[in-house]
């Protein structure tokens, strides 16, 4: 999940990743859409970051792949090797596990999707940073599309708008493209335990907020252990103002 701010005065686009394990209002933030829909998801994110959200776009991972293929692929630079022994890949009948060495890579849609989705190679924060890196590659590629590439541009925009959940029309998307294509991208920003978050175990029972208890003998409390079933993230000392302040600081830089 990425909060994006466009500053027309500084001509800068700031990307800030919100971790999916952030625990807010009794549930993880990534569960809100499935339960309540996009409007409630937007409302929760507004409350978390302390910023008004004017537009939203929900992109299916396979649409993400198709858009990159329509653009002819994207270029990214990995700062470190990406190794995920749990991520199985198969290409032209040859199967292996995910591995990309550090350096420059030209990625088609499938490769970009693999790099964006890999969860067991590094931390979830590194995954968020890689997703932003791919978005930067998409922006760089899009900057080279102009009036002469009108057919390709319209194909990309139509695929994006028709295959996603968004309140942005094709006409608006086209205006945004030409208005913002040369803005600087401020990426690599992730709300994390490196700044304002703590890792907090919470019970799975959303209704009672009681830990799960397992007893060898229910009549003997000393045989009981409490198990926290979900690892979550919350602001330090449960101070949600820290997240809002962190976001505002990034936007003010």
PLM features: residue spans?
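Non-catalytic, solvent-exposed segments at the cell envelope interface
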Residues: 1-253
